[in-house]
């Protein structure tokens, strides 16, 4: 089931981060488009269907919840950040600037200064190199202490023509958001996500700068616009994630590396992504490729 949710431009919200000195009033710019609804309204409707609307919403609407969250944070922050304006003043002004501490925050500094009084939230209260808790799970892919385990795919076990794909976060958008925007499009004038390869690897494959290439493995394939470099490691290709999927059979014409990466977790415990454990082959694209 897919329910259309509003974008940040279609709802009111508060923007903040634990390391920023500004708290921003994110005011709705336009009414929700089509049948889109605020996430809160969607879940409130679902809660009503199962008879727990009152427990979920606590008799507050969108703005009442923003006010409650702000005032709660304001009360807690007053001890460290000084006097902070009330919600009405904050919302009218559009932002609040808090006082920055005289010394920068250093992670675990309190613990290092007073390890007995400032214990960490671990069973021992200390930094644990070995975890009895994790070890007790009996997971063969995540034991109780750090250890190197051979990746499913890596250059140490690659065929001669295979390359290791790094699909990092893009520098011109957040994940895949606004991939259709001018800033993102400017990075791919041919409409295809760039892929960077060491110039020696490109020469060995008869490939040239600006050429449209096909990256592929047993899981799928995508196109990329080749960019050569002498600073990337030989045997490695780099293609940022975030291109919107543009499928043509098992091929993504836009250059989405998710068509190539493994859909597996790091371990039974963590279940993090292993997108960087990915081997591909790269060759010239033959025939029509334009989107």
Regions found by a protein language model. Give the residues of each.
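Short acidic, glycine/serine/threonine-rich loops at helix termini
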Residues: 1, 13-17, 177-178, 227, ...
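Structural motif
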Residues: 1, 162-164, 194, 236-237
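Catalytic alpha/large subunits of respiratory electron-transfer oxidoreductases
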Residues: 1-10, 50, 108, 117-119, ...
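Pocket-edge structural micro-motifs
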Residues: 5, 44, 122-124, 131, ...
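A conserved amphipathic helix/loop scaffold
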Residues: 30
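Long, contiguous, secondary-structure-rich segments that constitute the structural scaffold
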Residues: 33, 39-90, 175, 182-196, ...
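Long, low-complexity segments enriched in small/aliphatic residues
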Residues: 66-183
């Amino acid at each position: 089931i897919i329910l259309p949710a509003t974008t940040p431009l279609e709802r009111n919200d508060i923007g903040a981060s634990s390391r920023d000195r500004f708290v921003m009033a994110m005011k709705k710019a336009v009414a929700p488009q089509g049948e889109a609804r605020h996430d809160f309204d969607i879940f409130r409707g679902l809660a009503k269907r199962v008879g727990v609307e009152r427990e979920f919403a606590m008799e507050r609407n969108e703005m009442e919840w923003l006010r409650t969250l702000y005032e709660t944070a304001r009360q807690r922050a007053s001890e460290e950040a000084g006097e902070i304006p009330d919600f009405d003043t904050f919302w009218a002004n559009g932002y609040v600037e808090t006082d920055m501490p005289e010394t920068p925050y250093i992670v675990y500094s309190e613990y290092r200064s007073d390890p007995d009084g400032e214990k960490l939230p671990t069973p021992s209260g200390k930094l644990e190199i070995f975890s009895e808790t994790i070890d007790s799970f009996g997971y063969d892919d995540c034991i109780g202490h750090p250890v190197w385990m051979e990746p499913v795919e890596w250059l140490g076990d690659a065929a001669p023509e295979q390359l290791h794909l790094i699909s990092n976060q893009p520098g011109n958008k957040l994940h895949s958001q606004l991939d259709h925007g001018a800033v993102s499009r400017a990075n791919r004038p041919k409409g295809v996500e760039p892929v960077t390869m060491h110039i020696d690897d490109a020469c060995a494959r008869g490939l040239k700068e600006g050429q449209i290439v096909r990256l592929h493995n047993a899981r799928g394939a995508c196109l990329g616009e080749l960019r050569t470099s002498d600073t990337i490691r030989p045997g490695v290709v780099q293609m940022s994630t975030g291109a919107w999927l543009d499928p043509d059979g098992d091929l993504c014409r836009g250059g989405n590396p998710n068509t190539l990466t493994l859909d597996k977790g790091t371990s039974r415990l963590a279940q993090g992504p292993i997108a960087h454990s990915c081997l591909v082959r790269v060759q010239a694209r033959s025939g029509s490729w334009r989107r």
